Every structure is written in C-alpha cells, then in structure tokens.
Amino acid sequence: MQVSVETTQGLGRRVTITIAADSIETAVKSELVNVAKKVRIDGFRKGKVPMNIVAQRYGASVRQDVLGDLMSRNFIDAIIKEKINPAGAPTYVPGEYKLGEDFTYSVEFEVYPEVELQGLEAIEVEKPIVEVTDADVDGMLDTLRKQQATWKEKDSAVEAEDRVTIDFTGSVDSEEFEGGKASDFVLAMGQGRMIPGFEDGIKGHKAGEEFTIDVTFPEEYHAENLKGKAAKFAINLKKVEERELPELTAEFIKRFGVEDGSVEGLRAEVRKNMERELKSAIRNRVKSQAIEGLVKANDIDVPAALIDSEIDVLRRQAAQRFGGNEKQALELPRELFEEQAKRRVVVGLLLGEVIRTNELKADEERVKGLIEEMASAYEDPKEVIEFYSKNKELMDNMRNVALEEQAVEAVLAKAKVTEKETTFNELMNQQA
C-alpha cells in the first residue's frame, strides 16, 4: 500500500492510496472461496460448486465488495500510520479500476484543528458574592402569594399592579394599522407587555371611562412601518381588578409541601430553594465568563463537518420542543442554527483541549454531588438518585457535566478572578 497526504484547504485533507494488484486478487480469491462454501447452484451439492463457475457468476459483485472493503480498511490503516484525526465522515473518490493492475483512490475529509491554548492568564472573571437575606425570603413569599392570588373587581382608579379589561384601537396619522385593535383585552399592569407609555396612559382612569392616549413606538419595534412612529390609542376601560393575596394560613403553606403548615417551615423551605438557585446561578455566571474569555483568546478553525452535525442536533431539538418530527426538523433553515452550532463546536474543542492538557477525568464524588443537588428539588430525592444510578446514559451525561465543570475550574485557576458583592435579585435578573 502506497500512501500520500496533502492539504487541500484549511482543515481539508486528501489521502491518496494505491493498493497493489496482487493484494486485490488475493482478497478476491479468498472471498470467492467463502462464497463457494455457501452458495447453492442447481446440479451441484452445497460447497461443491467448481471455482470457475463461482467466479463466473459472482466474481464481479465479489470484486466490487472486496474493493470497497479494501478502500475502507486501507484508509483506516493509513490515518493510523500517519497519525491523522479525521473530523466527520470521509468522502471516497475511487480511481479507474482495471483488472490485474494496481488500484489508486483518494479520500477527502477534514481534520480536527491543532489547538494550542493561549491567553488564559488574561481572562477576566467577576464572581458574584451573594447572601440570601430575610428580605429576599420576604420578597419570594410575596411572589408565591401573588402567583396564588385571586382578582377582585374594584371601582377606584387603575394602579400599578392592577388588572384591566379594555377595548383599544390604535392609529398612526389617523389611520388604523394592522394588529392595533383588540376587544376584551386583559392586561396585567406592571409586566411590560405593551409599548412604553401605554400602561402609564391607563393608570388613574376608572372602569367605564373612554379616553385616548398618545404613545411612540420604539425605534427597535418589530413592525417596520411602526418604528419610531407617534400613535394614538382609543381606549374603552371596561373593568378594573385588584389582586387579593392569600393569607399565610396552614392550608396555604401545605400546598408547598411544608407538612407542619408553619410560616417558619415555609420560610426555611423557600430559603433552601433560593440558596440552591443561587448556587446554580453563580456557577453559571462564572462559567459563562470563563468560556467567553476562552473563546475570545483562542481563535481556531472549525471543521464544517462538525458544524453540520451540530446543526442537525439543534434542528432535532427545536423540532421536539415544538412537536415536530425528524422530517420537519431537517426542513428548518440551517441559518437559524449556524452561529449557535459553530459556537458550541468551538467551546467543545477548547474545553476538550483543557481536559486533555490537564489530564482530567470525571470526579465521581463531584458526579455524586451533582446528582444529589439536582435530586433535592424533587419530592423524593432518594428515588431520583436511585433512578440515575441504574441508568448508564444518565450517569454518563452527569459525568460529562462534572468534567466540563472541572475544565472550567482549570481555566479559572489561571484567569484573573475578582469578587463583587451583589444582591439575590440583581443576580437572578441578570440570569433572566
């Protein structure tokens, strides 16, 4: 076997391989012997068919199969010998085959980039320092009460957190526009669902009033014909409701799994959940900064085959989220996923190099801790832990999570990490 390797473009490679004629003939004869042992031909007992008849009847197809097998096996031998690491599936380009002559073919593929990590010491990471305070717990209890609130109609004027039912008609330069009209529209105030100025124009009015408000569409508004335009909305305020918060009764508290129904028990449970969310948020915040710094410091070529593969993964995930099938997934435009796919491949290659250079392996104690942390959010943590322990795929996924964390920590060990005090709400709002 003769082998030559050339670079086509960037990460592209072409391996040209020549297989000696006698190697082909030896392999063909060997396979024909195997065929002769199995075939049945009228007039002959199984295994007793003369080789010339076997060759005459099956020679062409056997030779084709043998060539395909030799091409594959010789390519694998070649890349092992040349220490080449292909990325993605190779493309075989067969040359012209003539009986009794050497056979030359080529294989085209991409290789993984040679990554030499740099700039780790210049990466800057700001680690949030946060404590869950009693005031934070009070705020979360208010949120829980609001989520369980009922609405009661009122006669007084609209206030910041009320709910209103309105009819409205919007116009620009006295002309109504598409999507600017609705009847019995229910709007919870204070959630920022409408354009700036819309809610402010409703505050202070009472049910039964009809009025007009003036607003301006933002320059970044999605409808091109409305960007930056001044508009008027004719409003018919049909109903105003105020939120009635439930009291922290034992019955209410037990809805959240606090068996004794005490306020102290609920506060303890809420604090525990907040601290778990906080730990995850800090970890994610630090991780995202470390990875962003790693990517900026290391500009690497990315094999197109890996991007294509990642796009397929993202397509299928998107289709599953919206109830589509595999055929619909493949019809989604690749442009929707290309940037994200490339980013994921780059991050994977860089973290892979961090893992390789630091000779990292998944820490089983960390894996155990991650599973326990995740399970603590469920009603029966022991059941979840046991389920994971019996599922190899889930365990392998968690080992990958642990290994990624260890790689990020290796980056942080060399990066410039500073600490900054912040509040629970500030950090969680940044995550959102």
From Swiss-Prot:
UniProt-listed InterPro entries: PPIase_dom_sf, PPIase_FKBP_dom, Trig_fac, Trigger_fac_C, Trigger_fac_C_sf, Trigger_fac_ribosome-bd_bac, Trigger_fac_ribosome-bd_sf, Trigger_fact/SurA_dom_sf
Domain PPIase FKBP-type: from-to ranges: 161-246
Key words, A-Z: Cell cycle, Cell division, Chaperone, Cytoplasm, Isomerase, Rotamase
Gene3D superfamilies in UniProt: 3.10.50.40, Trigger factor ribosome-binding domain, Trigger factor, C-terminal domain
Enzyme superclass (EC): isomerase
SUPFAM superfamilies: FKBP-like, Triger factor/SurA peptide-binding domain-like, Trigger factor ribosome-binding domain
Coiled-coil region list: none
One BP term from GO: 'de novo' cotranslational protein folding
Cytoplasm recorded as keyword: yes
Pfam families in the cross-refs: FKBP_C, Trigger_C, Trigger_N
rRNA-binding found in the keyword field: no
GO molecular function: peptidyl-prolyl cis-trans isomerase activity; protein folding chaperone; ribosome binding
Organism domain of life: Bacteria
A cellular-component GO term for this protein: cytoplasm
Reactions it catalyzes: [protein]-peptidylproline (omega=180) = [protein]-peptidylproline (omega=0)
The enzyme's E.C. designation: 5.2.1.8
Locations listed in the record: Cytoplasm
Domain remark in the UniProt entry: Consists of 3 domains; the N-terminus binds the ribosome, the middle domain has PPIase activity, while the C-terminus has intrinsic chaperone activity on its own.
Family that this chain belongs to: Belongs to the FKBP-type PPIase family. Tig subfamily.
Record's subunit section: Homodimer and monomer. In vivo most of the ribosomes are in complex with monomeric TF. Uncomplexed TF, however, is in a monomer-dimer equilibrium with approximately two thirds of TF existing in a dimeric state.
Its biological purpose: Involved in protein export. Acts as a chaperone by maintaining the newly synthesized protein in an open conformation. Functions as a peptidyl-prolyl cis-trans isomerase.
HAMAP family on file: Trigger_factor_Tig
Protein name as annotated: Trigger factor
Provenance organism: Shigella boydii serotype 4 (strain Sb227)
